[in-house]
Every structure is written in C-alpha cells, then in structure tokens.
C-alpha cells in the first residue's frame, strides 16, 4: 500500500487548528495529496493511481494494495482505473473509490477536512459525477468538498505564493499523461477550454518503447512502464546523455544496450505536436471567440503544468518553438514541481475557503 514522496503520519489537531485543508489531484497515472502537517509545513503524497487485490493466505479475505506496491508486486493484474483523469463507468468508479479510500486511510486524513480536488477541463459529465462520488464517499471533507479546473489549480503555484492567478488574465497549458489541455482564464473564469488525447505523455512512452526496439535492431523489447522510467530519469532538453542498461534474456544471460535517440526523438516530436495543437487549434479558436482576451493573455506569462513539464529544459524549448510558430515573443512559466502543482493550488484554495 505504498505511496512515494512524503508518506507521513502528520497528526493534524483539527480541534485546535480547524478543518485540515487538503488538495487532491486524481490523475490517470499518478495521484497527489497536498496538505499541511501540525506545524503548518506542506506534506506531499504522490503515488500511482492503481490497485490490485489478492486473497489473504490465512483468512481467505480480499486484500487491497495500491500505488507502487501494486504495480511492482502484481504487474499481471494491476488496474489503472481512470481515463483522462476520470472514472468513466460504474466499475471504474468503484475501483477508484476503493483506491482513494485506502490512500486517505493510510495517510490518516481526518474526516474534519476541507477538500478541493482538481478536475480536467473536458466535456464528460458522467465521468465528473463519478469522480465527485469517489471524493465525497471517501470519508473525508466533512467541512467542504469543492472542485476547480486542474489548469487553474496548477497555475496558482506558477504565479506566486498565494492565489494571484485567480486575479489574472492568462493562458494555461497542462502537459498531461493522457491529455493535452489548454485554456484561458479571466479572473478565474474559464474560457475556450481545449483538450486533446492525440498528444500525450502516454503516447510518447509508447513511441519510446517502439524506438528502443528499432534502435537496438529488435534485440530489446521494453514495456511502456520501463519506457516511462527511462523518460523520467534520462530525458533532458538541455543536456541529454546517452545511457546504458542491461536486460536478462530468455534462457539465461544478459544483454547490454545503449540508448542514444530513442528517448529524445519521440519527445522532440511530442513538442512539435504540442506547438501545432496550441498555436493552430487552441489559440486560433480563442482568437475567434475572445479576441481581446487572446491579445491580453499572449502578452502575459503562460502557465505550464503537468507531468511532462517536469522534463528538464522542456518549458524553455516549448517557449522557443511556440514563439517561432506565432512569430512573437512568448513567456512561459512553470512551478517548481509541475507534477504537484494542481494539488498544491487546490490546497491553497481549500485553505482560503476555510478562512472565509
């Protein structure tokens, strides 16, 4: 039942401190919780959004493991239950509910809490309703449960230490594992939301796996999880270095191989596709619908969040390519941890709502 990052037992005295403000981002690949400990210091829990069940050898009862433990110990039957950040049917909603209840129980998140969770900006009312049921049925959030767009939550840490983003007119890009999202905000109002599943981190991972087979002339086949690990560990737009790994071969023996192109070539194509979608689809639509907002927002920093934004140098490279495509200077800003930003921003909103 493992969660990586800060898996802490931060006993929060709700009687003395009031409801615990909690930010939540349930993602298709990873889930993040963000909340203060009893000293007010931020605590982060980041874990894979997956679970597996097994039968207890002694009692025969069903047991649940989630996150990294489930992925490592039960790769043959681990289940990822979200698509585009949402549980799309009743079965996946039940799985997501089990996962989230186990997570908050193990992190000792109290019922006396104020919960704000980030939601994708896609048109899927049934999925959003299912996600709401997952959060509301978890046993936390007695004080309040609210949702806000993920791109708004993620932009909050990018713009400062408070909630300055809510008072701004700006553009937000979310480079996610299952979607590329873009939208404009005018003082917190969502405008021209755009989402596509054609340009994603997951698809890039699949391309990396395919290119490794091609680069090694068919001698090496890796799964998507391994490809994602290579991307997260080695990808770098500033200073990529070729790396070597070893795999065990069927029948015994080991094979050492070196990767020179298979990580960065797919990422190079990914960025080109992001620029094309943002410049020629999202921004074209925004200019057509809200010309003044388009003009104002392009003259201000564009917030970039999502797991793909964690790759070193990718934000600067995206800034250069987008500016070249638009034939104007653009300024992209990202929080220190783009993958945690949505949960952090959601937590700040929860804190403000409990103060009001």
Model segments located where?
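Conserved phosphate-binding catalytic cores of ATP/NTP-utilizing and phosphoryl-transfer enzymes
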Residues: 2-17, 145-173, 341-351
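Gly/Thr-rich phosphate-binding beta-strand-loop-beta motif of the actin/hexokinase/Hsp70
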Residues: 9-43, 162-191, 238
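Conserved phosphate-binding loops in N-terminal lobes of ATP-dependent enzymes
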Residues: 15-22, 26-127, 274-286
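Residue-level signature of catalytic and energy-coupling elements of molecular machines
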Residues: 31, 100, 135, 208, ...
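Phosphate-binding glycine-rich/basic clefts of nucleotide- and phosphate-handling proteins
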Residues: 52-62, 186-297
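Helical "lid/coupling" subdomains associated with nucleotide-phosphate turnover
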Residues: 87-93, 97, 146, 153, ...
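Glycine-rich phosphate-binding loop and adjoining helix at the ATP-binding site
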Residues: 106-159
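Small-residue (GG/TT-enriched) beta-loop-alpha framework at ligand/catalytic clefts
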Residues: 137-218
């Amino acid at each position: 039942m493992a969660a990586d990052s800060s898996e802490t037992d931060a006993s929060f005295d709700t009687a003395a401190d009031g409801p615990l403000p909690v930010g939540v981002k349930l993602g298709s690949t990873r889930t993040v919780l963000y909340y203060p400990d009893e000293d007010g210091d931020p605590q982060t829990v980041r874990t894979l959004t997956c679970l597996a069940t097994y039968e207890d050898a002694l009692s025969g009862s069903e047991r649940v493991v989630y996150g990294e433990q489930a992925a490592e110990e039960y790769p043959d039957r681990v289940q990822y239950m979200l698509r585009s950040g949402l549980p799309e049917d009743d079965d996946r909603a039940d799985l997501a509910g089990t996962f989230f209840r186990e997570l908050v129980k193990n992190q000792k998140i109290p019922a006396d809490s104020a919960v704000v969770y980030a939601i994708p900006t896609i048109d899927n009312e049934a999925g959003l309703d299912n996600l709401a049921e997952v959060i509301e049925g978890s046993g936390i959030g007695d004080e309040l449960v609210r949702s806000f767009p993920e791109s708004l939550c993620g932009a909050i840490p990018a713009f400062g230490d408070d909630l300055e983003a809510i008072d701004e007119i700006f553009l937000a890009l979310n480079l996610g594992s299952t979607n590329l999202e873009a939208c404009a905000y005018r003082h917190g109002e969502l405008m021209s939301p755009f989402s596509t599943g054609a340009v994603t981190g997951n698809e890039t991972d699949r391309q990396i796996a395919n290119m490794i087979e091609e680069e090694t002339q068919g001698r090496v086949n890796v799964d998507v999880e391994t490809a994602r690990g290579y991307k997260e560990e080695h990808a770098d737009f500033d200073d990529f270095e070729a790396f070597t790994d070893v795999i065990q071969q069927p029948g015994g023996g080991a094979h050492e191989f070196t990767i020179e192109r298979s990580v960065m070539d797919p990422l190079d194509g990914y960025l080109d596709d992001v620029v094309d979608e943002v410049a020629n689809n999202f921004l074209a639509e925004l200019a057509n619908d809200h010309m003044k907002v388009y003009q104002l927002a392009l003259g201000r920093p564009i917030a970039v969040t999502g797991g793909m934004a964690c790759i070193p140098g990718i934000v600067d490279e995206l800034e250069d390519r987008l500016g070249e495509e638009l034939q104007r200077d653009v300024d992209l800003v990202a929080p220190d941890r783009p993958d945690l930003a949505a949960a952090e921003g959601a937590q700040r909103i929860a804190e403000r709502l409990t103060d009001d």
